[in-house]
């Protein structure tokens, strides 16, 4: 209904190279940041959210239609996910925030500090078949302080050009260098890397954190990583794993699902292995300091309605956290491809998914982070040694030629 108004066009965001995609997102963020500042009027809802293509999808699918339907305008402030800054905004003496769009970890932290209103699942729209919202949302989506809207994930992708005898179909392929030889890109971080190691080694998603919390489980994770140590390249910038896949520097890579969507749409040689994906979500919540709680509840009900979530998922490859919304997702309105295969929460992709547990890492991560740093040092030292050996071998080949009369 509003697709013609998108600037830059959606096809640019979906298929742009990484530099172009960043520029497109920057233009969108600048446009969003130019929106009205926080208001005080009763018919204005003050809302904090993210920028980029994600923020633009919210403007089109949620903010403008809500204002048109209810007469309550949305005054948006863009933030970068910094929890301390968000708390400062919530506790500000100025115009209070009425609704916030936060990560699962931020939702948990703010809830524990008593800064959020209680979320009543009964206030949310029922599913089209009449079932209660609580039953229609995916597990863990509705909590005492907020309701999840969309999910993204870290998933393993592969380059089809590298495999002539069949492509990976299971996360176990990450450790199988005999059948799937070549370099693998993993995060330069214990988080995600250790979960992926256990998933690839056969640990069911529901047992991963229990296993990782025991000494023998941690040993198992690092033993799995040791199997592929000579074939691992570690990344610390979000664009690196996809770039390396496209440039044939690696044959498999753990990367963020949104970036993998753009890569797969723009290059048919890139496939996504959803088995063993690690997902997280964004959620809507209402600060206790809100001056407009009635409209805040109305907005969250509006924005989590199945049809609205489906419409957003047709624009951007984040998975709706409602089962009924997933069945409504169709084609991208501009590039005309079916979006459901690219959504982390699509039934065929979600079966073996693991929910990332930030709270677990905050409570248990110190020793694992130190151990991973030591493992990383081994990986990098081995890479330096191999490069030195390669250069020495090349130099040795040149010596006879130099000595010849």
Predicted features, each with a name:
Residues 346-405:
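Conserved C-terminal helix/tail region of periplasmic/extracytoplasmic solute-binding proteins
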Residues 42-109:
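Early extracytoplasmic/lumenal segment of secretory-pathway proteins
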Residues 155-162, 198-199, 281-295, 311-314:
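A bilobed periplasmic-binding-protein/Venus flytrap-type ligand-binding module shared by bacterial periplasmic
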Residues 287-353, 388-392:
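Mature extracytoplasmic/periplasmic domains
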